[in-house]
């Protein structure tokens, strides 16, 4: 089911999307191969993930996925679905697309859970996401910093990259 406004369409990904999506990110110098999106589609068919795509005025603008069983153990143990891989192309930012994608993912999550989870990176590239999640009512899950979904022990040294995250939750039901 697609959410339609005058200029924005949020819909589930389909098999025609992976090449377009990959090309859009490749043009920015980001490595997001079509195989990743094809995996998302396979997981959708298996009932494990919902990949939502945003089109702004008919042009690919971004996407987000909802994983029904999180790779992060505390979410999986509590049956908290996880929103992951929120990406809005830079030319389409600050138009409400990220929030619309989150609205759609949270709405889907609310059909199965009263809580949804999300992870956010720790360095400045994630600054906009950090602010959006706080404004939307997400709070840390209390488990501390994670690296590749594993707790970072006090005194440990890690690389602050895309694998370092703070996990957050929000009521949705």
Please identify what each model-predicted range represents.
Residues 96:
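Conserved G/P- and acidic residue-centered "switch" motifs that form tight phosphate/ATP-binding loops
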Residues 1-6:
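Basic/polar N-terminal segments that are highly enriched at the extreme N-terminus
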Residues 99, 123-156, 161:
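Conserved active-site alpha-helix within GNAT-family acetyltransferase domains
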Residues 8, 15-19, 23-85, 89-90, ...:
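Acetyl-CoA-dependent GNAT
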Residues 86-93, 121-123:
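A short, internal acetyl-CoA/4′-phosphopantetheine-binding micro-motif in the GNAT/acyltransferase core
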Residues 109-122:
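Conserved GNAT acetyl-CoA-binding A-motif
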Residues 49, 161-167:
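Short hydrophobic/aromatic beta-strand or adjacent loop that forms the aromatic wall/cage
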Residues 151, 163, 171-173:
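Acyl-donor (CoA/ACP) binding surface of acyl/acetyltransferases
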